[in-house]
Every structure is written in structure tokens, then in C-alpha cells.
From Swiss-Prot:
Pfam families: Pyridoxal_deC. One of its GO terms (molecular function) is L-tryptophan decarboxylase activity. SUPFAM superfamilies: PLP-dependent transferases (SSF53383). It catalyses: L-tryptophan + H(+) = tryptamine + CO2. This is Tryptophan decarboxylase. It is an enzyme of class 4 (lyase). Its cofactor is pyridoxal 5'-phosphate. Inhibited by (S)-alpha-fluoromethyltryptophan. InterPro entries: Aromatic_deC, PyrdxlP-dep_de-COase, PyrdxlP-dep_Trfase, PyrdxlP-dep_Trfase_major, PyrdxlP-dep_Trfase_small, Pyridoxal-P_BS. The lineage of its organism: Bacteria, Bacillati, Bacillota, Clostridia, Lachnospirales. Homodimer. Its EC number is 4.1.1.105. The modification N6-(pyridoxal phosphate)lysine is found at K306.
């Protein structure tokens, strides 16, 4: 029977020009890698953002799905020139917007290898060594957090999925089907939007999400937090979770984790930390003390595709007690009975939402093995220094206001000539952002702090230099003065 099947396969492939045999596949991969590496080698000289014009999008729309295939090299070349070229390059050293994704080439290699083997990493028996590696990495990361008793976790696509996974465990640990409608959750006015979205998905409506004000350092005000908790308890609600942040998206601020933990313990609440950005600082010998208190949480989210230099998407959710994830996500349908494991050798489909999932943790393990944690820690510390260099470049400049000083590789500032109104200053800073984006030299967007439109830099690329920071600030100053003059003439 097997010979018949083999014969049919060979018959199908004979004369079929567009089926890739091993030689064609090798040639296509070599060609792509050569072109990609040549592009990456000259990255400092390339624009950070290349915008696609309408006619270029129209050109792509004209490429219909063919009935007959095309040569692979033709399509790959088309993608390189017409698709990948037009993007905001989060791997560029001067991409300072959002939280950049400066992926290590080692992670990229790991991604290629894992994709080539197309591993199903949902169950330990399907890929036992993959499961072993992922669990060992998660245990090591949990140790850095301070989870030591019975920790565990799972690799997910990003912080949004990590947060909703942890929040599901929090709901199931502290609420029941009967009192779910009374549960209240507490975030700050600087908490990432994915947290509120996740709370809504698990059944906590906006009317039961409390947004706690922050102090002058953009940290959650724990006095206001306890007042809100006490008020809700008196009103018959059930406060069940507080979400603190280790590295807010706007300013890099770290909430008072130890104080929040004490309040959660006092009121029998789950304490989750959104560490998507800042948890990586735990690998920095110099700065890890900034995150004192992470080990007091019940769960934490952590994005490796941010400050651990991984390709998208690679993130983790870690819990102090893995049984909480198992309680929320374990199912045992008939088609998985042959693969069922116990809690000591858990299948990842029993501790997270995904059944079929890629082996996201292998590239992180490869990166840790090749680079070592010391080098990664140094790269993280370099990000802190980049923000300091930006602040030092700003200080002597006239009419610039630092709104949030350098911390956690971030800084917020604005051009604020005193003869302009606040509204005019807001417009001016928006125009400065647009102009530097148009220049292609750096990517810097605005955000809003204390009601002011500000320019925000998040600088975590290990290859960014002091010269990059100085020239970026010089350009912003130049554009600010030019636009100011244009506005006064208008």
C-alpha cells in the first residue's frame, strides 16, 4: 500500500514546475538570507519608516490569486521589493516609537529553525524535548521574578494574551459564577489598554473597572486604591484583582508593587503585574532592584519580544502556583484522552487557551544559550543609558520641557515656546513628530501626559549610539524652531 501511495506522489510531482524540491528550497532560502543580511548590514543608513503611497497599495491589489502558480524567486522578490520594504522598522536602532522590537539575529535564526520543523507544541508527548526546554526556561524566568514554591507558566503571543490568561486565573480563583457580577478590578490611569480589554472579555464590565489616579511620578496612588476598595466593599461589590504595572507604556513608571501586594493580602485579592515591558529589567544586575516586590504577586506578564530581543511574538505568563492555570484551562475531551498528563508533566493546552500552538520558547532558549544572561543584562542597561543621553542632549536646548525624565529607557518631553498657548504647543509637537517621521531619520510619536501632547522616546536597541540620540534631539530642535517660525508667520 505504501508503494502505491509513493508512486502516486511521484506521479503528481513529475512535470510540476512549482513544487519546491530540496534544491529549489535551498536556493530560495539562500537567496533570501543573502539579501536580508545585506539589508541588515547597512541598517544605520536606511530610513526608519518608509510609507506606502496609494498607488503602491493599488499595485498589490492588482496581484490576483492565480490558478496556476508562479516561480518562487519571482514572488519572493516581489515581496521583498513591494511588501516588506514599506514599514516602520521596529528593528532599526532609531525606531523610538511604541516599545520597539529590536530582535536579536539569534532569535531570528531560532524562528527559522522552529518554523522549518513546524512543531505542534500543545502537548508534551507530541514534542517532549520542546516541552522540556520551554518548561525549563519558564522555571528560570519564574525564579528571576521570585516565584519559588510551585511556579509555572506558558508561552503566548504577546502581553495581551498573557494578561487575559492571568486575569482568567484571577477570576476563577476569587469569584464564582454566582457572584461574578459583583467582581471589581483595579487599574491605574496609566495601565495598558490590553488589561481593560482582557477584563471585559472575562466578564468584568467597564462599570466594574476602577481606574485609580497616579501620582506625580505616574505611579498608582495606593491611598486612592485602598479608598476605592473600601468603598466598593461597603457597596456590596467584591474587589478581586489589582493590576500593577512594572514599566508603563507612556513613561516606564513602576507602580509601588510592595504596597499593592500588602493591600491585596489585606483584602484577599489577586495581585497581577503587567510586566510586559519592564520585567526584563530583572536580568539587569544594576537595575533589578527597581522591581522589588515582583515575587509578591500571584501572576506576571512578560514580553520577550520587547526587552529580551525576540522576534514577534514571544511572551510569557508566569504564576506563583501553576495549579491556578490548570484549574482555569484544563479540559479532557475524548480526542485528547490518550495524551492526558498530570500536573507534574503538564500539557500546555491544560494551562492556557491554545490547543495548537507553535514552540515560541525555543528561540528564547537559543538566544539565552548563545548570548548568555550577562550580555542580555548589559544590553538592557544600555537602554537606560540611551534615555539619559537623550535627556543630556535636551537640557541645554532652549524652550524644551522635560515632562517625564529618563527612566527605564524612556523619556517624555515637548517643545514649549512660552509665547504659544498650550493648544498651540500641542499642535507644534504633533507637527514635529510628523516631520521627523517624514525625514526617515527616526521614528518618534506623541502621547499625552498631564493633558499635554508630548514627544516620547523609548530607546532599547543595543546598536543605538550616543551619536544617534544627540543627532535625533538636534533634528527635533531644528524642526521645532522651523515649525514655530512657520506658525508665527501664518
Amino acid at each position: 500500500m505504501s508503494q502505491v501511495i509513493k508512486k502516486k506522489r511521484n506521479t503528481f510531482m513529475i512535470g510540476t514546475e512549482y513544487i519546491l524540491n530540496s534544491t529549489q528550497l535551498e536556493e530560495a532560502i539562500k537567496s533570501f538570507v543573502h539579501d536580508f543580511c545585506a539589508e541588515k548590514h547597512e541598517i544605520h543608513d536606511q530610513p526608519v519608516v518608509v510609507e506606502a503611497k496609494e498607488h503602491q497599495e493599488d499595485k498589490i491589489k492588482q496581484i490576483k490569486i492565480p490558478e496556476k502558480g508562479r516561480p518562487v524567486n519571482e514572488v519572493v522578490s516581489e515581496m521583498m521589493n513591494e511588501v516588506y520594504r514599506y514599514r516602520g522598522d521596529a528593528n532599526h536602532p532609531r525606531f523610538f516609537s511604541f516599545v520597539p522590537g529590536p530582535a536579536s539575529s539569534v532569535s531570528w535564526l531560532g524562528d527559522i529553525m522552529t518554523s522549518a520543523y513546524n512543531i505542534h507544541a500543545g502537548g508534551s508527548k507530541l514534542a517532549p524535548m520542546v516541552n522540556c526546554i520551554e518548561q525549563e526556561v519558564l522555571k528560570w524566568l519564574a525564579k528571576q521574578v521570585g516565584f519559588t514554591e510551585n511556579p509555572g507558566g506558558v508561552f503566548v503571543s504577546g502581553g495581551s494574551m498573557a494578561n487575559i490568561t492571568a486575569l482568567t486565573a484571577a477570576r476563577d480563583n476569587k469569584l464564582t459564577d454566582i457572584n461574578l457580577h459583583l467582581g471589581t478590578a483595579y487599574i491605574s490611569d496609566q495601565t495598558h489598554s490590553s488589561v481593560a480589554k482582557g477584563l471585559r472579555i472575562i466578564g468584568i464590565t467597564d462599570s466594574r473597572i476602577r481606574r485609580i489616579p497616579t501620582n506625580s511620578h505616574f505611579q498608582m496612588d495606593t491611598t486612592k486604591l485602598e479608598e476605592a476598595i473600601e468603598t466598593d466593599k461597603k457597596s456590596g461589590y467584591i474587589p478581586f484583582v489589582v493590576i500593577g504595572t512594572a514599566g508603563t507604556t507612556n513613561t516606564g513608571s513602576i507602580d509601588p508593587l510592595t504596597e499593592i501586594s500588602a493591600l491585596c493580602k489585606k483584602h484577599d485579592m489577586w495581585f497581577h503585574i503587567d510586566g510586559a515591558y519592564g520585567a526584563s529589567v530583572l536580568l539587569s544586575p544594576k537595575y533589578k532592584s527597581l522591581l522589588t516586590g515582583t515575587g509578591l504577586a500571584d501572576s506576571i506578564s512578560w514580553d520577550a519580544h520587547k526587552w529580551l530581543f525576540q522576534t514577534y511574538g514571544c511572551a510569557m505568563v508566569l504564576v506563583k502556583d501553576i495549579r491556578n492555570l490548570f484549574h482555569s484551562f484544563h479540559v479532557n475531551p475524548e480526542y485528547l484522552k490518550d495524551l492526558e498528563n498530570d500536573i507534574d508533566n503538564v500539557n500546555t493546552w491544560d494551562i492556557g487557551m491554545e490547543l495548537t500552538r507553535p514552540a515560541r520558547g525555543l528561540k528564547l532558549w537559543l538566544t539565552l544559550q548563545v548570548l548568555g544572561s550577562d550580555l542580555i543584562g548589559s544590553a538592557i542597561e544600555h537602554g537606560f543609558q540611551l534615555a539619559v543621553w537623550a535627556e543630556e542632549a535636551l537640557n541645554p536646548k532652549k524652550d524644551w520641557e522635560i515632562v517625564s525624565p529618563a527612566q527605564m529607557a524612556m523619556i517624555n518631553f515637548r517643545y514649549a515656546p512660552k509665547d504659544l498657548t498650550k493648544e498651540e504647543q500641542d499642535i507644534l509637537n504633533e507637527k514635529i513628530s510628523h516631520r521627523i517621521l517624514e525625514s526617515g531619520y527616526a521614528a518618534i510619536f506623541t502621547t499625552v501626559l498631564n493633558g499635554k501632547t508630548v514627544l516620547r522616546i523609548c530607546a532599547i536597541h543595543p546598536e543605538a549610539t550616543q551619536e544617534d540620540m544627540q543627532h535625533t534631539i538636534d533634528l527635533l530642535d531644528q524642526y521645532g524652531r522651523e515649525i514655530y517660525t512657520e506658525m508665527k508667520k501664518a
